[in-house]
UniProtKB/Swiss-Prot annotation:
This is 3-dehydroquinate synthase. Its main location: cytoplasm. Zn(2+) binds at E184, H247, H264. NAD(+) binds at G106, V107, I108, G109, D110, T130, T131, K142, K151, F169, F170, A171, T172. Belongs to the sugar phosphate cyclases superfamily. Dehydroquinate synthase family. It is found in: Cytoplasm. It comes from the Bacteria.
Length: 365
């Protein structure tokens, strides 16, 4: 089975990825899980309904397994749900020899990792992602919950024991979710490899391709790109910030929409267009943005922003971005495809770029 090794400073661990990953790793994994006092599975209602039986079959021989079913979507990454999960773990009697399995998409992985990092000052956990989007979030150890003023503002760096990525789960994903996850695949290509970007653009030309074309080699390449960056900079003191390409504006948009109006990948797509536009202004980026946007539209993405989004709110949310220091907003831009840089953007540039990408010039309120 294809296996990618993540060599972070704090831990080295495998990412298992293929269409039958859970079955292929079952014997080895259950032997490891049997060493723990208790297995605590964190999932959400949607994943539990569709896939709990599959995980149950894998965990059937383990003596003590407890499930916690969180709300669907970003609602799960709140203080309220975080506290409720902790309460359930304490009431169930989980000790420091327990293990947590985050079974779901990126939200569950973020929440589950943060719970594991903070319960009794840290217990081991496994990532078992079920979405395309989670190929990015499940790898690298970033774990967090949201604050009303910003996405992922309360978090930690905490690596899993392993990532078990069974791509069979994709068959039940709605098109909108697949498209959201695909945005992170595009991001990895933009920051690393023009050839990879061209391969994506040539292979995926309409929404049905998300179901009929093989995503796995592109997911593997994206994970390898991220693993290489994490090996250099686990805690985002330097090059790991490049993985935030499109996220400064994208996270600001998500926060404005109360983490519900846009899916993460939808917001990040807007953010990448914003960053590419600013890259043209600052670095003269040689890239056919019009062709790129046409391709995105063919895949079903919206590439122009709702003009009701007020600039003042976006700017305020961008100031809450984790890369912002001394009140200076840091943008990940591209000098060329595959060559990202950090750029301190002033308010005038942020506003001028905003006007260029917003439908009808935006709302300056």
């Amino acid at each position: 089975m294809p296996e990618i090794t993540v060599r972070a400073k704090s831990k080295t661990y495998p990412v298992y990825i293929n269409e039958f990953a859970l079955e292929d790793i079952r014997e080895k994994w259950t032997k490891s899980l049997a060493k723990f006092s208790h297995v605590f599975v964190l999932t959400d209602g949607h994943v539990a309904e569709l896939h709990k039986a599959k995980l149950d079959a894998v965990l059937a021989d383990l003596p003590v397994v407890t499930y916690y079913v969180a709300p669907n979507g970003e609602e799960a990454k709140t203080f309220r749900v975080y506290e409720d999960v902790m309460t359930k773990m304490i009431e169930t009697g989980l000790d420091r020899k327990a293990v947590l399995i985050a079974f779901g998409g990126g939200v569950i992985g973020d929440l589950g990792g943060f719970v594991a990092a903070t319960y009794m000052r840290g217990i081991p956990f496994y990532q078992v992602p079920t979405t395309v989007l989670a190929h990015d979030s499940a790898v690298g150890g970033k774990v967090a919950i949201n604050h009303p003023l910003g996405k992922n503002m309360i978090g930690n760096f905490y690596q899993p024991e392993a990532v078990i990525y069974d791509t069979q789960f994709f068959a039940t994903l709605p098109e909108r979710e697949l498209r959201s996850g695909f945005a992170e695949m595009i991001k990895h290509a933009l920051i690393s490899d023009l050839t990879l970007l061209r391969a994506l653009m040539d292979t995926f030309t309409e929404p049905k391709d998300f179901y009929t074309k093989d995503l796995t080699p592109f997911l593997q390449r994206g994970i390898e790109i991220k693993a290489n960056i994490v090996a250099q900079d686990e805690t985002e003191q330097g090059v790991r910030a490049y993985l935030n390409f499109g996220h400064t504006f994208g996270h600001a948009l998500e926060a404005y929409g109360n983490f519900g109006k846009w899916l993460h990948g939808e917001a990040i797509t807007y953010g990448m267009i914003y960053a590419l536009t600013m890259s043209e202004t600052i670095y003269g980026l040689d890239f056919d943005l019009a062709e790129f946007k046409t391709w995105l539209e063919q895949l079903g993405y919206d590439t122009t922003f709702d003009a009701s989004v007020p600039f003042s709110k976006i700017l305020e949310n961008m100031r809450h971005d984790k890369k912002t220091t001394f009140n200076e907003i840091s943008m990940v831009l591209l000098e060329e495809i595959g060559k990202p840089v950090i750029f301190k953007a002033d308010d005038d540039l942020i506003f001028e770029t905003y006007k260029r990408v917003m439908r009808k010039g935006g709302n300056v309120i």
